[in-house]
């Protein structure tokens, strides 16, 4: 993790 996985989250660590 640590990258933008979802367009909704800027951090991308949550999802």
Swiss-Prot record:
UniProt-recorded name of the protein: Lombricine kinase
Family per record: Belongs to the ATP:guanido phosphotransferase family.
Enzyme class: transferase
EC number: 2.7.3.5
Assembly and interaction partners: Homodimer.
Residues spanning the membrane: none
This protein's record includes keyword Transferase: yes
Entry keyword set: ATP-binding, Kinase, Nucleotide-binding, Transferase
One Gene Ontology term of the molecular function aspect: ATP binding
Secretion signal span: none
Swiss-Prot/TrEMBL catalytic activity: L-lombricine + ATP = N-phospho-L-lombricine + ADP + H(+)
Top-level taxon: Eukaryota
Organism: Lumbricus terrestris (Common earthworm)
């Amino acid at each position: 993790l640590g990258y933008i996985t979802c367009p909704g989250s800027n951090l991308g660590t949550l999802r």
